[in-house]
Swiss-Prot record:
Its main location: cytoplasm. ATP binds at S351. Its cofactor is Zn(2+). This is Methionine--tRNA ligase. A motif ('HIGH' region) lies at residues 12-22. Belongs to the class-I aminoacyl-tRNA synthetase family. MetG type 1 subfamily. One of its GO terms (cellular component) is cytosol. Pfam families: Anticodon_3, tRNA-synt_1g.
């Protein structure tokens, strides 16, 4: 039975190019999942975009001496190019500075406001004494007043998991310039989380199939739930759609209020650009639809508490009741799939400290699938993981090149050399049946892992089949069979068996290694697009909905989006029979081995730090 599956991917912040730590958390896992779901015959919508509001973007624009819109345009395009190069198969990757996004965000806010879940209060806001600019919560650090840990942020303490306000911190300082922030009274709208706590608790306690770290963290947040400010004193953001506020260019909606609405607004934009403006409702209003949210662990709060609270309040499901908004009852997340951090030499990736490997540099030298493979087998799925060049070289050479690449090349080479085509097999022996049965069984078990976002377990099982297939060839010694004319039928059977297992493994590796999978598809003498790739499309800021207020996006503005025609690809999650008589050409090397010295030195653009 076909399922509708929404894959919502965390929105990268557009204040710089992406490094591999970013895509290890939100990028590759979500794409493996989406590609697998499509291959399984499900109706998939995968959306994301660049997050372009908030103080950090203003700070970066000042550093680069450009307008904030120019900065957003610059990094939006860079990120689009990086993610397209990595092969992330978005149905739409857009941005938050669009008229459509502004309008959808304002609709969500109005629904919450009308239902009584947006309350107006006077709070203490942090500003920079030297610039007068508002300091975002995450740009203030100090000692946690609850557990005493240094380095707690103004929104939460990563050590104890409690939500904080900047004014709660002991000895708060600005991360931008180290100065002590000044706290002033200011009026803001707060999301009344306590009024939604009971509904949130009931929903979360039904999420028993979530990753344990995500569920535990999310439930702990309920112990200290409090109203949370959803507006800011800033001139760069979405106008607050309330009379007396919408034309005040000094107050805008909080960047995290608008960013999580992006999953919905991107779905609406996708439907509009696809020619069926109501198609988004399949993924948001149908309660049978499954929705999965992919991100790094630092974003759990916003996806397991803030976003669900917004959805519940919009539908009038909190203690204050309320009416269902114009967009209808919107689906809550089926699962929040959070990854841990990918570090480098034991430290978090940091552009300012030079602890960084940019995606664009990596793609230029090594291509996309080497990085996709490393993240799949050694990424931070359940624990923080350290990236080292030594491990990267080792895994590419020993597993990808010597394992998978060797299996493909020697199998197809021997079949080409001895038959010029896929040979006709004779009667299968027990050894042939055993390896074929192993590959057959892997389809079901790998699928079960991928359906539960257990990507490491999935690829480990596939690579086990690859290893057993290489052992099968070593045991059967087809190069010896080729020297004996009386063994020609046995040679044909062994090579046909090996070709079938290559085909099976290639199918199962497709979500992980789509670019390599297309090459193997062609190496096996097959035509057509096996694994579709995303495309960059230039669009204009057209919108089916119009926002209100001041500081709105230019309706004539053009920008790049990522889209793709994935429904026409041939890849299916099932055995594709290798057909005797199919012409085979001599294969080119599938995966280039890396110089072992690279593991000791790293490349010039990201050398090993001694």
């Amino acid at each position: 039975m076909t399922k509708n599956v929404l894959v919502s991917v965390a929105w990268p912040y557009a204040n710089g190019p992406r490094h591999i730590g970013h895509v290890a958390g939100f990028g590759v896992p979500s794409d493996v999942f989406a590609r697998f779901q499509r291959m399984s015959g499900n109706n998939v919508l995968m959306v994301s975009g660049t997050d372009e509001h908030g103080t950090p973007l203003l700070v970066q624009a000042d550093k680069e001496g450009v307008t904030v819109q120019d900065l957003a345009d610059k990094y939006n395009r860079q990120i689009v190019e990086d993610l397209t190069g990595l092969g992330l198969s978005y149905d739409l990757f857009t941005r938050t500075t669009t008229s459509n996004h502004y309008a959808v965000v304002q609709e969500l806010f109005r629904g919450l406001y009308d239902n009584g879940y947006m309350i107006k209060e006077t709070t203490l806001g942090a500003i920079s004494p030297s610039t007068g600019r508002t300091l975002p919560d995450r740009y203030i650090e100090g000692t946690c007043p609850i557990c005493g840990t240094d380095g707690a942020r103004g929104d939460q303490c990563d050590n104890c998991g409690n939500q904080l306000d900047p004014a709660d911190l002991i000895n708060p300082v600005s991360k931008i310039n180290g100065e002590t922030p000044e706290f002033v009274e200011t009026e803001h709208f707060l999301l009344d989380l306590p009024a939604l706590a009971e509904a949130l608790t009931e929903w979360l306690k039904g999420r028993e199939d979530w990753r344990p770290n995500v569920l535990k963290f999310s439930l702990n947040l309920l112990d200290d739930i409090r109203p949370r400010a959803m507006s800011r004193d800033i001139d760069w953001g979405i106008p607050i759609p309330v009379e007396g506020w919408q034309d005040n260019n000094a107050k805008k909606l909080y960047v995290w209020f608008d960013a999580v609405v992006g999953y919905l607004s991107a779905s609406i934009e996708w439907a509009y650009r696809s020619g069926d403006p109501e198609a988004w409702r399949t993924f948001w209003n149908d309660p049978e639809t499954k929705s999965y949210y992919f991100m790094g662990k630092d974003n759990i709060t916003f996806h397991s508490q803030i976003w669900p609270a917004e959805l519940l309040g919009y539908a009038g499901k909190g203690s204050r009741g309320g009416e269902i908004g114009d967009l209808g009852v919107l689906n809550l997340p089926t699962e929040v799939v959070s990854s841990e951090f990918l570090t480098m030499s034991g430290s978090k990736f940091s552009s300012s400290k030079g602890v960084v490997i940019y995606v664009k540099d990596f793609l230029k030298e090594f291509g996309p699938d080497a990085l996709r493979y490393f993240i799949a087998v050694a990424g931070p799925e359940n624990n923080d993981t350290d990236f080292t060049w030594d491990e990267f070289v080792r895994r590419v050479n020993n597993e990808l090149a010597n394992g998978w690449g060797n299996l493909v090349n020697r199998t197809v080479s021997m079949a080409h050399k001895n038959f010029g085509e896929v040979p006709v097999p004779g009667a299968l022996e027990e050894s042939d049946k055993k390896i074929l049965d192993l590959a057959t069984a892997a389809f079901e078990s790998v699928a079960a892992n991928l359906d539960q976002s257990k990507f490491k377990a999935g690829i480990s099982e596939i690579m086990h089949v690859v290893g057993e297939a290489n052992a099968y060839i070593a045991e059967q010694e087809p190069w010896k069979l080729a020297k004996d004319d009386t063994k020609r039928e046995r040679l044909a059977t062994v090579l046909w068996t090996a070709l079938q297992v290559v085909s099976d493994c290639n199918t199962m590796l497709t979500p992980y290694l789509p670019h390599t999978a297309q090459k193997v598809h062609e190496t096996l003498g097959r035509d057509g697009i096996w694994a579709a790739t995303p495309q960059i499309v230039e669009v204009t800021n057209e919108s089916p909905r119009q926002p209100i207020g001041v500081g709105l996006p230019d309706p004539e503005h053009t920008y790049p989006v990522i889209m793709g025609d994935y429904k026409t690809q041939l890849a299916k999650w099932q055995r594709i029979d290798v057909v005797p008589g199919t012409t085979l050409e001599k294969p080119a090397p599938l995966i280039a081995k890396l110089d072992p010295e690279l593991g000791e030195t790293g490349p010039e653009w990201a050398p090993v730090q001694n």
